[in-house]
Amino acid sequence: TATDSTTDLKFTNGAYWDLKGNSSVSDLTVGKGSVINMTADSSRYSNLQVDNLTATDGTFVMNAGSVDGGGSYSDKLVIDKTSAAGTNTIKLISTGGMEAAARNQAVLVKGAAADTKFAVSDSVYANGLYEFDLTLADKENNGKYDWFIGSLQKNTVDSVNTMVSANQVAYTAWIDGNGTLRQRLGELQSGADNGVWARMFGGKLGGDEFTNKYKTYQLGYDAQAGDWRVGAAYEYSDGSLNYTSGSGENKIGAVSLYGTLQGKDNSILDIVVKRGRIYGDVDVYGKYSDQGDYSTDATSIGVEYSKRFDGGNNVYFEPQAQLTFGRIDGYDYISNKGVKVAYDDLNSFIGRLGIVAGKAFSRGDVYVKASLLHEFSGNSSVTMLAANGESYSADKDYGDTWLEAGIGGNITLGKNCELYGDVERSFGGDVTKNWGANVGFRYSF
């Protein structure tokens, strides 16, 4: 370590110098594999002033970023007299402010000869939201050359991409729980008695940045109230997430109220109102590791209408239409690295047109189904602010169109018991349901 004026210094065979503060050297030799570390004093930028430089295949490690009190944006190597031919590497370290350093063309080397060259060795990550790819440029100044940050390209790091994807996870998990009347209650019989029911459904959702394997448990009770069947249900969902560079969990607890009106013309109107809370966590691995936990409230209101037509020989057809409005309230959290993450409210409006074709038997039925769904809304925005001042914002549009298809059935186990279920998958959306399965049991009394 050196801090004061020194006459001659020679570093060869991988030698290492920790430079703290400013230093002046008459003759400095930096051989192959040797390192001059100018970042040992992290509280300020350092200047290394050299009369004569002889350097080939050496490395200069420098701080760069936000401006200091003296107007500097980086450490600096200043050559007062001569420099020998050679190519060397500059490795930049930053705790933030790289865009300001590039915008102000921070000078890293001043006074080099024309055949003394420098290049940046690696991209720069300042423990924030971006990784910066830099190139150096030189400009002639009174017969000598100054080397400065010439261009900068920034790329969001994995932690940003993963935390953005977490909002899409919350959205897809919430809308997947909407379901249909047939999935919730099976083949509901007109004039049936009061009943309790339970079902379990799960599946695997996949997008560009994540997969979500989930299972949901739902328990409900309903009773006849005039022409309407009214009921309530509670559900709990647990999802295990894999991101491109991380993992996480997603949980939902929700209460729903519903009313179902069965017409004498084989039509059914079903209205469901649901309110719940979404919980999640994100763990990002590797170089850009970070962790965050979040929670928010969500609401949905769904209206479904269907009507059954007799096709003869116990075959039936059932066109369906469904509209579901959903809202995920805005939320924010601070990650372990001090990144402030904030999501705006997300509104959803999904329309579904479907058809069920089935065949009834003495103790139940089997059917195939297909639906076309479209998200008419699904807009959201996210902002992030890192502890080092780097910021990120993006608007996300989850508007999409997709198909769902499946098979299912109902079976009567006794006078008061019914078992029902289905399997399905989706096609064509940005997020697909690779598979989904639903099984339920209803007891009437």
Where in this protein do the model-derived segments appear?
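Outer membrane beta-barrel translocator domains of Type V secretion systems
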Residues: 153-317, 424, 429
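Solvent-exposed, glycine/polar-rich loop segments of beta-barrel outer-membrane systems
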Residues: 159, 213, 240, 244-246, ...
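Outer-membrane translocation/initiation segment of Type V secreted surface proteins
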Residues: 56, 61-67, 71-73, 89-226, ...
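Transmembrane beta-barrel domains of outer membrane proteins
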Residues: 16, 182, 186-187, 213, ...
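Short glycine-rich beta-strand segments
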Residues: 200-205, 235-237, 274-280, 320-332, ...
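Outer membrane beta-barrel transmembrane domains
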Residues: 256-261, 343-445
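Outer-membrane beta-barrel architecture
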Residues: 59, 191-198, 227-231, 266-272, ...
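Extracellular beta-strand/loop-rich repeat segments of large surface/secreted proteins
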Residues: 1-106, 110
